From Swiss-Prot:
One of its GO terms (cellular component) is ribosome. InterPro entries: Ribosomal_bS21, Ribosomal_bS21_sf. This is Small ribosomal subunit protein bS21. It holds the Pfam family Ribosomal_S21. The keyword Ribonucleoprotein applies. GO terms for biological process: translation. NCBIfam families: S21p. HAMAP family: Ribosomal_bS21. Disulfide bonds: none annotated. It comes from Pelagibacter ubique (strain HTCC1062). Keywords: Ribonucleoprotein, Ribosomal protein. Belongs to the bacterial ribosomal protein bS21 family. One of its GO terms (molecular function) is structural constituent of ribosome.
Length: 64
């Protein structure tokens, strides 16, 4: 990932980097990998994420 620093404005470049990492899901992966997750908990989490995604898609379809 490449971020341009304009006018030596490091703070703005850091904000842009953080925003891009957030959109890519980097922080979520780091959080999940920082602690061991039991296989049963992993299956449960993935199932909940799938249900949430399906509900979100159905909600968007109903809007249109």
């Amino acid at each position: 990932m490449k971020i341009e620093v304009k006018d030596n404005n490091i703070e703005q470049a850091l904000r842009v980097l953080k925003r891009k990492l957030q959109r890519d899901g980097f922080f979520k992966v780091v959080k999940l990998k920082s602690v061991y997750e039991k296989p049963s908990e992993k299956k449960k989490r993935i199932l909940q994420e799938n249900i949430k995604r399906v509900k979100k898609l159905n909600k968007l379809k109903n809007r249109i």
